[in-house]
Amino acid sequence: NSATTAVYSFQDWVSA
């Protein structure tokens, strides 16, 4: 689901 993917992408960006 794209909403879940967006959350993971956001978390990856924040932790970068």
UniProtKB/Swiss-Prot annotation:
Q: Name one GO cellular component term.
A: host cell
Q: Name one GO biological process term.
A: symbiont entry into host cell
TM segment ranges: none
Q: Keywords, A to Z?
A: Activator, AIDS, Apoptosis, Cell cycle, Host nucleus, Host-virus interaction, Ion channel, Ion transport, Transcription, Transcription regulation, Transport, Viral penetration into host nucleus, Virion, Virus entry into host cell
Query: Where in the cell?
Result: Virion; Host nucleus; Host extracellular space
The free-text function statement in the UniProt record for this protein reads: Involved in the transport of the viral pre-integration (PIC) complex to the nucleus during the early stages of the infection. This function is crucial for viral infection of non-dividing macrophages. May interact with karyopherin alpha/KPNA1 and KPNA2 to increase their affinity for proteins containing basic-type nuclear localization signal, including the viral matrix protein MA, thus facilitating the translocation of the viral genome into the nucleus. May also act directly at the nuclear pore complex, by binding nucleoporins phenylalanine-glycine (FG)-repeat regions.
Assembly with partners or alone: Homooligomer, may form homodimer. Interacts with p6-gag region of the Pr55 Gag precursor protein through a (Leu-X-X)4 motif near the C terminus of the P6gag protein. Interacts with host SLC25A4/ANT1, SLC25A5/ANT2, SLC25A6/ANT3, SP1, CDC25C, RAD23A/HHR23A, COPS6/HVIP, TFIIB, UNG, SF3B2/SAP145, KPNA1 and KPNA2. Interacts with host VPRBP/DCAF1, leading to hijack the CUL4A-RBX1-DDB1-DCAF1/VPRBP complex, mediate ubiquitination of host proteins such as TERT and ZGPAT and arrest the cell cycle in G2 phase. Interacts with ANKHD1.
Miscellaneous comment text of the record: HIV-1 lineages are divided in three main groups, M (for Major), O (for Outlier), and N (for New, or Non-M, Non-O). The vast majority of strains found worldwide belong to the group M. Group O seems to be endemic to and largely confined to Cameroon and neighboring countries in West Central Africa, where these viruses represent a small minority of HIV-1 strains. The group N is represented by a limited number of isolates from Cameroonian persons. The group M is further subdivided in 9 clades or subtypes (A to D, F to H, J and K).
Q: What is this protein called?
A: Protein Vpr
